[in-house]
Amino acid sequence: MVRALILDLGDVLFNWDAPASTPISRKTLGQMLHSEIWGEYERGHLTEDEAYNALAKRYSCEAKDVAHTFVLARESLRLDTKFKTFLQTLKQNANGSLRVYGMSNISKPDFEVLLGKADDWTLFDKIFPSGHVGMRKPDLAFFRYVLKDISTPVEDVVFVDDNLDNVTSARSLGMRSVLFHKKDEVQRQLTNIFGSPAERGLEYLSANKTNLQSATTTDIPIQDNFGQLLILEATEDPSLVRMEPGKRTWNFFIGSPSLTTDTFPDDLDTTSLALSIVPTSPDVVNSVIDEIISRRDKDGIVPTYFDNTRPRVDPIVCVNVLSMFAKYGREHDLPATVAWVRDVLYHRAYLGGTRYYGSAEAFLFFFTRFVRNLRPGTLKQDLHALLSERVRERLNTPVDALALSMRIQACHALGFDAPADIATLITMQDEDGGWPAAVIYKYGAGGLGITNRGVSTAFAVKAITGSPVKTETNIGGDGARAVSAMSSLEARRLQPISSVGDWVRFIIASLHVHLAWLWNVLLLSKVV
């Protein structure tokens, strides 16, 4: 596919340095440049002398003063060499798939002067000066003329101009358009449009491997396991991260805690995430699950810390615990916690964030992990339907890059796409290939936010490269019984087998699973 970039020249690639003193005042000069006389001159319908004489008559001044003022303006014209180099690199990196065109409101005499301001014009495949074409921006006819000449589908054309009227005309014809205001911002947008966002994101992660650490919103470095685990799950690349695993349970911090108490307990959030991602022996998982069950509060809700002196509860922490339980077929051991997070989802109690998390998208994203880990059945089916409804409600809501990536991933996990959100996410990519830091979680006391560009980038790459997955949410009849048996067997496999009775129950459960599987095969053969 060949794409096209159409650029304005004046005030985009070339800049004017206004002369300190001119025969014509700056106010009058501005009026001249916006007059219909100047428009006709730029279309090539008036000669230079005709235009200057008409302007002198209109604005009660001498034609020679008009001419001298524009001579001074021409002399001040300067090529932006850095922006030109950027454009050359952009075109070179496209490997022949990008054509660059100039489209400028400029008279024939002024265009001849402009050509002398640069030695090398090979950047452009063609230039369309209004004085030679007989039309000018924002005339729709001028845009249609250029589109016909370059023979590129309008959806593959990007237009850059510093004038909003011109940009509006281009957009009305279906062109993707960038209003030139700040050069750095335009360069970022063009890099995102014509580059490969995913490849650039992966390059950023690779260039910063093992240094993708967190920081507070006040730029204080934070060494934490949680952010590393999120990067690991999103990328499946252990070489990118540096963690400090716990022997059994995990701590949020790597090394000494920061900006909190001198000693900091292990927490259920980090531990559950780790046991969902990092291969761990069943005996360890089983012992942690049993301890978590024993730590439920009077409402049957799991806490945040393995420390009874810190009775904190957060619905997203609960969801992450349930996700780990579901991975091992044990979600039924926390019925009150399941019921509570379902109520949080149903009543949209997550919209204002939670104690430790700032965005609604964080709750929805982590909830999709929980639903994904559930075995097919009524619970999965009901939660999947409600969660899908809640995620759809958030589509196109303005949020930061991380929250947007979380939302897109949630959409994909639930089986539908979010093309508008993906397009927005791509525009947020920074020039270095990473995505902006955004608050992932926060300190419970005071609410100081913790960010990580590595997490933002890893999540963004996964979001834009992902696609909706087909999910099975419910199995009825004998299939449901087979799944139930398998869940029971999975749970038993996590428990120590220390007696003859345990062995007997394990063997019976295994036979139940295999017989159910055989019955399903027979049913399927009848259908086929």
UniProtKB/Swiss-Prot annotation:
Presence of the UniProt keyword Nucleotide-binding in the record: no
What pathway is this protein a component of?
Answer: Secondary metabolite biosynthesis; terpenoid biosynthesis
The EC number(s) this enzyme carries: 4.2.3.194
Tell me one GO molecular function of this protein.
lyase activity
Q: Which SUPFAM superfamilies match?
A: HAD-like
Alphabetized CDD domains for the sequence: HAD_sEH-N_like
Might you name a Gene Ontology BP term for this protein? Answer: terpenoid biosynthetic process
Substrates-to-products reaction catalysed: (2E,6E)-farnesyl diphosphate + H2O = (5S,9S,10S)-drim-7-en-11-ol + diphosphate
Which Gene3D superfamilies does the record match to this protein? Answer: HAD superfamily/HAD-like (3.40.50.1000)
Enzyme's top EC category: lyase
So which domain of life are we looking at? Answer: Eukaryota
Phenotypic consequence of gene deletion: Abolished the drimane sesquiterpenes biosynthesis.
Q: Keywords in UniProt for this one? A: Lyase
**Function of the protein:** Drimenol cyclase; part of the gene cluster that mediates the biosynthesis of various drimane-type sesquiterpene esters, compounds that exhibit diverse biological activities and are widely present in eukaryotes. The pathway begins with the synthesis of the backbone drimenol by the terpene cyclase drtB using farnesyl pyrophosphate (FPP) as substrate.
As a miscellaneous remark, the entry gives: The various drimane-type sesquiterpene esters produced by the A.calidoustus drt cluster include asperiene C, asperiene A, (6-Strobilactone-B) ester of (E,E)-6-carbonyl-7-hydroxy-2,4-octadienoic acid, ustusolate A, ustusolate C, ustusolide E, ustusoic acid A, (2'E,4'E)-6-(1'-carboxyhexa-2',4',-diene)-9-hydroxy-drim-7-ene-11,12-olide, RES-1149-2, as well as the 3 newly identified compounds calidoustene A, calidoustene B and calidoustene C.
Q: Which family does it belong to?
A: Belongs to the HAD-like hydrolase superfamily.
Quote the protein name from its UniProt record.
Answer: Drimenol cyclase drtB
Q: Which organism does this sequence originate in?
A: Aspergillus calidoustus
